[in-house]
Amino acid sequence: MSITTEITAHYWAFAVFLLSALGLCVFMLTGGFLLGARARARSKNVPFESGIDPVGTARLRLSAKFYLVAMFFVIFDVETLYLYAWATAIREAGWVGFIEATIFILILLAGLVYLVRIGALDWTPERSRRLRRAGPIGETPRHQE
Protein backbone atom coordinates (compact mmCIF):
# COMPACT_ATOMS: atom_id res chain seq x y z
CA MET A 1 0.00 0.00 0.00
CA SER A 2 1.40 3.38 -0.93
CA ILE A 3 1.77 6.34 1.40
CA THR A 4 -0.88 8.31 -0.49
CA THR A 5 -3.42 5.52 -0.04
CA GLU A 6 -2.69 5.31 3.70
CA ILE A 7 -3.09 9.08 4.14
CA THR A 8 -6.36 9.01 2.18
CA ALA A 9 -7.63 6.13 4.34
CA HIS A 10 -6.81 8.10 7.51
CA TYR A 11 -8.61 11.18 6.20
CA TRP A 12 -11.67 9.12 5.28
CA ALA A 13 -11.71 7.47 8.70
CA PHE A 14 -11.51 10.88 10.37
CA ALA A 15 -14.24 12.28 8.10
CA VAL A 16 -16.52 9.31 8.89
CA PHE A 17 -15.87 9.82 12.61
CA LEU A 18 -16.72 13.54 12.42
CA LEU A 19 -19.87 12.93 10.38
CA SER A 20 -21.08 10.17 12.70
CA ALA A 21 -20.43 12.32 15.81
CA LEU A 22 -22.23 15.27 14.23
CA GLY A 23 -25.09 13.01 13.11
CA LEU A 24 -25.43 11.57 16.62
CA CYS A 25 -25.58 15.07 18.13
CA VAL A 26 -28.21 16.21 15.63
CA PHE A 27 -30.22 13.01 16.22
CA MET A 28 -30.22 13.46 20.01
CA LEU A 29 -31.13 17.16 19.86
CA THR A 30 -33.90 16.56 17.32
CA GLY A 31 -35.25 13.57 19.28
CA GLY A 32 -35.39 15.61 22.47
CA PHE A 33 -37.13 18.46 20.69
CA LEU A 34 -39.73 16.24 19.01
CA LEU A 35 -40.41 13.85 21.89
CA GLY A 36 -40.08 16.26 24.80
CA ALA A 37 -43.08 17.69 26.57
CA ARG A 38 -43.93 21.32 26.12
CA ALA A 39 -45.11 22.95 29.32
CA ARG A 40 -46.12 26.57 29.13
CA ALA A 41 -47.53 26.63 32.65
CA ARG A 42 -46.25 28.65 35.52
CA SER A 43 -44.87 25.56 37.26
CA LYS A 44 -42.39 24.91 34.46
CA ASN A 45 -39.54 26.44 36.44
CA VAL A 46 -40.41 24.62 39.67
CA PRO A 47 -38.07 21.73 40.51
CA PHE A 48 -39.70 18.32 40.89
CA GLU A 49 -38.89 16.65 44.21
CA SER A 50 -40.54 13.24 44.70
CA GLY A 51 -43.99 14.57 43.87
CA ILE A 52 -44.03 16.96 46.81
CA ASP A 53 -45.24 20.47 46.08
CA PRO A 54 -42.54 23.04 46.81
CA VAL A 55 -42.96 25.48 49.67
CA GLY A 56 -41.48 28.93 49.18
CA THR A 57 -39.08 29.89 46.45
CA ALA A 58 -35.86 28.24 45.39
CA ARG A 59 -34.33 31.48 44.17
CA LEU A 60 -31.88 32.67 46.79
CA ARG A 61 -29.80 35.80 46.60
CA LEU A 62 -26.31 35.21 47.90
CA SER A 63 -24.00 37.90 49.07
CA ALA A 64 -21.11 38.82 46.79
CA LYS A 65 -18.77 37.77 49.58
CA PHE A 66 -19.59 34.13 48.90
CA TYR A 67 -18.44 34.61 45.32
CA LEU A 68 -15.28 36.26 46.66
CA VAL A 69 -14.56 33.21 48.79
CA ALA A 70 -15.18 30.99 45.77
CA MET A 71 -12.70 33.02 43.71
CA PHE A 72 -10.08 32.77 46.45
CA PHE A 73 -10.62 29.03 46.51
CA VAL A 74 -10.13 28.78 42.74
CA ILE A 75 -7.00 30.95 42.82
CA PHE A 76 -5.35 29.02 45.62
CA ASP A 77 -6.49 25.70 44.15
CA VAL A 78 -4.68 26.55 40.91
CA GLU A 79 -1.65 27.57 42.98
CA THR A 80 -1.73 24.15 44.62
CA LEU A 81 -1.82 22.46 41.21
CA TYR A 82 1.24 24.39 40.04
CA LEU A 83 3.12 23.64 43.24
CA TYR A 84 2.20 19.95 43.04
CA ALA A 85 3.55 19.78 39.49
CA TRP A 86 6.71 21.52 40.68
CA ALA A 87 7.06 19.14 43.64
CA THR A 88 6.84 16.07 41.42
CA ALA A 89 9.61 17.39 39.17
CA ILE A 90 11.78 18.95 41.87
CA ARG A 91 14.88 16.92 40.99
CA GLU A 92 14.72 17.95 37.34
CA ALA A 93 13.93 21.58 38.18
CA GLY A 94 16.86 22.04 40.55
CA TRP A 95 17.64 25.37 42.18
CA VAL A 96 16.24 27.36 39.26
CA GLY A 97 12.85 25.70 39.75
CA PHE A 98 13.05 26.30 43.50
CA ILE A 99 13.72 30.01 42.98
CA GLU A 100 10.88 30.26 40.45
CA ALA A 101 8.46 28.52 42.83
CA THR A 102 9.54 30.84 45.64
CA ILE A 103 8.92 33.90 43.46
CA PHE A 104 5.50 32.48 42.50
CA ILE A 105 4.55 31.97 46.15
CA LEU A 106 5.81 35.44 47.12
CA ILE A 107 3.73 37.09 44.39
CA LEU A 108 0.61 35.28 45.59
CA LEU A 109 1.36 36.17 49.21
CA ALA A 110 1.84 39.82 48.23
CA GLY A 111 -1.59 39.75 46.59
CA LEU A 112 -3.10 38.17 49.69
CA VAL A 113 -1.51 40.80 51.96
CA TYR A 114 -2.85 43.53 49.68
CA LEU A 115 -6.37 42.07 49.85
CA VAL A 116 -6.19 41.90 53.64
CA ARG A 117 -4.94 45.49 53.83
CA ILE A 118 -7.75 46.92 51.71
CA GLY A 119 -10.34 44.95 53.67
CA ALA A 120 -11.47 42.66 50.87
CA LEU A 121 -11.60 39.73 53.29
CA ASP A 122 -13.57 41.55 55.99
CA TRP A 123 -17.13 40.32 56.43
CA THR A 124 -18.11 43.27 58.59
CA PRO A 125 -19.13 46.41 56.72
CA GLU A 126 -17.80 48.86 59.37
CA ARG A 127 -14.12 48.31 58.65
CA SER A 128 -14.72 48.35 54.90
CA ARG A 129 -16.51 51.71 55.14
CA ARG A 130 -13.76 53.10 57.33
CA LEU A 131 -11.08 52.03 54.85
CA ARG A 132 -12.98 53.49 51.92
CA ARG A 133 -13.12 56.87 53.66
CA ALA A 134 -9.44 56.70 54.55
CA GLY A 135 -8.16 56.51 50.99
CA PRO A 136 -5.21 54.52 49.65
CA ILE A 137 -3.21 52.08 51.76
CA GLY A 138 -0.28 54.41 52.43
CA GLU A 139 -2.54 57.18 53.71
CA THR A 140 -4.59 55.11 56.19
CA PRO A 141 -4.47 56.73 59.64
CA ARG A 142 -3.72 54.44 62.58
CA HIS A 143 -6.47 55.60 64.91
CA GLN A 144 -9.69 56.60 63.28
CA GLU A 145 -13.09 56.84 64.93
Swiss-Prot record:
It is an enzyme of class 7 (translocase). NDH-1 shuttles electrons from NADH, via FMN and iron-sulfur (Fe-S) centers, to quinones in the respiratory chain. The immediate electron acceptor for the enzyme in this species is believed to be ubiquinone. Couples the redox reaction to proton translocation (for every two electrons transferred, four hydrogen ions are translocated across the cytoplasmic membrane), and thus conserves the redox energy in a proton gradient. It catalyses: a quinone + NADH + 5 H(+)(in) = a quinol + NAD(+) + 4 H(+)(out). The gene is nuoA. Coiled coil: none annotated. This is NADH-quinone oxidoreductase subunit A. HAMAP family: NDH1_NuoA (MF_01394). The chain crosses the membrane at residues 14-34, 66-86, 96-116. Keywords: Cell inner membrane, Cell membrane, Membrane, NAD, Quinone, Translocase, Transmembrane, Transmembrane helix, Transport, Ubiquinone. Its main location: membrane. Its EC number is 7.1.1.-. InterPro entries: NAD(P)H_OxRDtase_bac/plastid, NADH_UbQ/plastoQ_OxRdtase_su3, NDAH_ubi_oxred_su3_sf. The keyword Zinc does not apply.
